[in-house]
From Swiss-Prot:
Coiled coil: none annotated. Keywords: Cell membrane, Disulfide bond, Glycoprotein, Immunoglobulin domain, Membrane, Receptor, Signal, Transmembrane, Transmembrane helix. The gene is CD80. SMART domains: IG. Costimulatory molecule that belongs to the immunoglobulin superfamily that plays an important role in T-lymphocyte activation. Acts as the primary auxiliary signal augmenting the MHC/TCR signal in naive T-cells together with the CD28 receptor which is constitutively expressed on the cell surface of T-cells. In turn, activates different signaling pathways such as NF-kappa-B or MAPK leading to the production of different cytokines. In addition, CD28/CD80 costimulatory signal stimulates glucose metabolism and ATP synthesis of T-cells by activating the PI3K/Akt signaling pathway. Residues 33-131 form the Ig-like V-type domain. The chain crosses the membrane at residues 244-264. Homodimer. Interacts with CTLA4; this interaction inhibits T-cell activation. Interacts with PDL1/CD274; this interaction blocks PDL1/PDCD1 binding and thus PDL1/CD274 inhibitory function. Interacts with CD28. GO terms for cellular component: external side of plasma membrane. Residues 144-225 form the Ig-like C2-type domain. This is T-lymphocyte activation antigen CD80.
Amino acid sequence: MGHTLRPGTPLPRCLHLKLCLLLALAGLHFSSGISQVTKSVKEMAALSCDYNISIDELARMRIYWQKDQQMVLSIISGQVEVWPEYKNRTFPDIINNLSLMILALRLSDKGTYTCVVQKNENGSFRREHLTSVTLSIRADFPVPSITDIGHPDPNVKRIRCSASGGFPEPRLAWMEDGEELNAVNTTVDQDLDTELYSVSSELDFNVTNNHSIVCLIKYGELSVSQIFPWSKPKQEPPIDQLPFWVIIPVSGALVLTAVVLYCLACRHVARWKRTRRNEETVGTERLSPIYLGSAQSSG
């Protein structure tokens, strides 16, 4: 036979315990929600444990940071221990929500990190707090660089496009007017330590035409590109193809120059002849004998 509780009647002890347990589980659920942090390679990440603690409380607490069930860092009785993979680049920020600080991020650092806080009560440690943080690592390729590497033939130029330091594996394509061009010497390399990729490719094109060539690098859902513009060299037209308004002044200038040069030459020749004639006259006068006929007859 069922019983009905009157208003104001206190709940049985078992119901109190059930309610307390439900509230505790609800609190644990909300405190263990997974937050997201996204950073780039070589940057610093701060993963918050979302739990405030004073320096004086450290002696009675145990704090564990682990990644995918593997230990990263622990604080026991105030002593910090860092596991080998994270040494010299990982430390706790105790006064800032027990955050885990990771320097010089690597691709291998991506994953879910869990912070566990245990408190000493009556000689035994029980879990006081639990939270998780998912760390995503981006490795973006920079804008590729395009360099001139020579002329395989007189009318052919070769260029190279390259970029490094990105992830995941890239694909490089040369494009012009929406169509992919035929590349040469395309290489993709991955650094075994950092897992980052490098890519380079070369392209030959005819220098007698204008071009707007695009080097496109796709990696995952992202892409970067660089444009290489080329204008064909300007050639001077033959003289017989010059427009008349250019030919007439040029021809007039040439004729005028020729006339001036001819006049100067004639003037120079005339002056030279006159000088020569004067020199000959002076020489003749010096060589002629003195006439003495009248003097001899008078004797």
